[in-house]
Amino acid sequence: MTDNTRLRIAMQKSGRLSDDSRELLARCGIKINLHTQRLIAMAENMPIDILRVRDDDIPGLVMDGVVDLGIIGENVLEEELLNRRAQGEDPRYFTLRRLDFGGCRLSLATPVDEAWDGPLSLNGKRIATSYPHLLKRYLDQKGISFKSCLLNGSVEVAPRAGLADAICDLVSTGATLEANGLREVEVIYRSKACLIQRDGEMEESKQQLIDKLLTRIQGVIQARESKYIMMHAPTDRLDEVIALLPGAERPTILPLAGDQQRVAMHMVSSETLFWETMEKLKALGASSILVLPIEKMME
């Protein structure tokens, strides 16, 4: 990490965002061996170093200028931002873009056998959480006083252990809450992964590499959200067919040999294609409908 000409990116070593971050970098064409236990991994084909750390260390590494970029959950980023502001600091960074993975929600949960009449039910209660600043901001806005019980793991066991009356924790399916006799009652923050950049002057070569990386990330995300569609469509109902398939551009229309009533239609659709949509296309007279994934995309 002593070569300042190389772009330094921090990502989670293991956990919820690790696999998705690896896949994103790979699909952007960055060749890195991330299967070892090394803290630092060097790209084989670009001047990029990957620093693999705990997720809650990533915001600080970016804010302190130790690394150039970080892939991090917005919940962790916002918690660290509030923490530093509470200590009188003025943390600086740029959010380059939101990513299409790492979705979760930070929610309040209470024992299933307790009545819930809104956030006021928590007035004067003790709440266990790993996100004390996000929790405080939310309940302060509601004018609710509470006592915080800071836990760095296994937050969901706090009520049964007598440590707290309720919890504030990340929720995905709710199965863990249910297994511990809890129910989700209020979402206080919704989060996805994001790409952030340190504040301060950036070397021109690094900035050019960041711009290239952003273009590739945009292409990867667009490809994931799009499908390449081919079909035969009746010429007298083309407008209705196109209306069912919002796309980045107008479709390509090709004549069919020996068929004046239909054409071949090719297009990239930004709309997730459900069975219902395909059934509507068929009802309009479309046939030979093919829906294909897109590996890479650049407009």
From Swiss-Prot:
The kind of enzyme this is, by top-level EC class, is transferase
**What keywords appear on the UniProt entry?**
Amino-acid biosynthesis, ATP-binding, Cytoplasm, Glycosyltransferase, Histidine biosynthesis, Magnesium, Metal-binding, Nucleotide-binding, Transferase
Cofactor(s) in the UniProt record: Mg(2+)
**Record comment: activity regulation:** Feedback inhibited by histidine.
What Pfam families does the entry give?
HisG (PF01634), HisG_C (PF08029)
- The species this protein belongs to is Escherichia fergusonii (strain ATCC 35469 / DSM 13698 / CCUG 18766 / IAM 14443 / JCM 21226 / LMG 7866 / NBRC 102419 / NCTC 12128 / CDC 0568-73)
Main subcellular location: cytoplasm
Q: Name the protein family.
A: Belongs to the ATP phosphoribosyltransferase family. Long subfamily.
> What does the record give under GO molecular function?
ATP binding; ATP phosphoribosyltransferase activity; magnesium ion binding
Q: Does the keyword Membrane apply?
A: no
Q: Where in the cell is it found?
A: Cytoplasm
**What job does the chain carry out?**
Catalyzes the condensation of ATP and 5-phosphoribose 1-diphosphate to form N'-(5'-phosphoribosyl)-ATP (PR-ATP). Has a crucial role in the pathway because the rate of histidine biosynthesis seems to be controlled primarily by regulation of HisG enzymatic activity.
Q: What GO biological process terms does the UniProt entry carry, in alphabetical order?
A: L-histidine biosynthetic process
Give the protein name, as stated in the record.
ATP phosphoribosyltransferase
